[in-house]
Amino acid sequence: MKFKKTIAILAAAACAGSVMAGCGKKETSADEKVKLTWVFGGPGTLEDSDMVWGEYNKLLEDYLPNTTVNFKCIPHADYAEKWRLMSAAQEDVDIAWVGWQLNFIDEVSMGSYLDMTELINKYGQDMKKEFPDWLLDLTSINGKIYAIPNYQMMASPIGALVPKEHIDKGWIDLDAANKVFNGEKVITKEDYKIFEDYLTTVLKNEKNPPRVSKQFLTRGIKWNIGLPAEGREIITCNAVVKVGDKSCKVYDLINDFPGNYDYYDIVNDWYNKGIIRKDILENPEETEGDDYVLWWCQMLKGAENSYASRYSREMVSFTTDPEIFVSYKGSSTNTAITSQSKHPDRAMQLLNLMNSKKGAPLLNMATYGIEGKHYKKTGENSIEFLGKETIGSANNKYGYENWALGNALDTYTTQYNFDGWNEYIDKEINRKAMPSCLMGFTLDTAPIKMEIAQYQAIMKEYEYLDAGTTPNYKEKLKERNAKLKAGGSDKIVEEVQRQVNKWMKSK
């Protein structure tokens, strides 16, 4: 990789004086026939992939003449390793998916992806019109854009889910819960008495101990209690900022919010009272729904119907964390133009189509296949997928996730969502979410690499404390915190603040 990085640095230096996007590469004439290779993560090549991709290229001729695409779908489990080999060997790849398996910052530093800023300005205006102003900041480093986030749901309010039959019996006071969890105050130990009373009632009236989702404990309580009412965003480890705080002051999650430790009092008290089941450490999953009475959930329109289908009972949800924000850290699914692409201008023209309504028929075909064979239309912009399993399964003849190849909110809605889902996510969720105050910031973890590794290892060692099963939890928390401090947790906060300050001055 050192050789590759050296080549990338030399190439960047050679292009420093170039004003042409694509590092001064010759622009492709419109009548030149171009074949682009596009690699992405998914279930791999499916039974009908070659047939669909052939039809896609026929359709593409109407949108981008003299262009064909050679799609290569790599199974998710193999994607990171295969991409690194392709990139190191400078294989003939023009467009590459950048998923959660890869460290985006590291890939950029190694020269894997092209700076797309000027290409987007020249060829990407259709997609830019559809994006929120902050979207391309998610994949920007030092003011340069290295990938296009595959636009989908980028934020979500958090809530709790209980069986409707328990609401009907009056076992939980929803009005009281909605008054408390409204995002206007710091949540305290006393506020969770609402849930304790509910679980105690279940314990008294049902034969089995109440099963509380472990995700509800950690996401529904631990990530709320004693923390800023406006929300907090983790930069790394214990270094956090308050959502919307334009000063970008970095706080220490371990030491600056003592009220957060009330979480451990709550879960240990509940465990001792029998309202947290005794096998929670051995059985933390929440996929078996029959005995569960309290879950963590995403608060989205129509979610209750989805959860009802999943757990085979009617559900009622209510918000426990109404503040939604978009993290600066980037999207988990993006698309980049590779540094070795011979036709970056044509690649960008294609990405503009796949990320805008202008090219929605192309994206829908690449995602869902052929009408009548892989799906049937149920409305102007809605379909019923005809595969054996859910979309993205290797057992289907065709069908890829809509977030893999472009703007997911320009694809058909399926039977898994309601009509108008895309508009709802775009307007009611994404555009109403608060963008991070750190949009455009990139943390260089090199100066604190050892400290981060130490922190993560120690937190993993003491993760069992989250379940409430440890009688001497206070002693163990002190022991954990002493190890964190010795491992450099203070240095993490100091270094992050230093970098944030430097970034703010450079804006």
Model features per residue range: what roles?
Residues 2-3, 10-15, 19, 23-507:
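Extracytoplasmic/secretory soluble proteins
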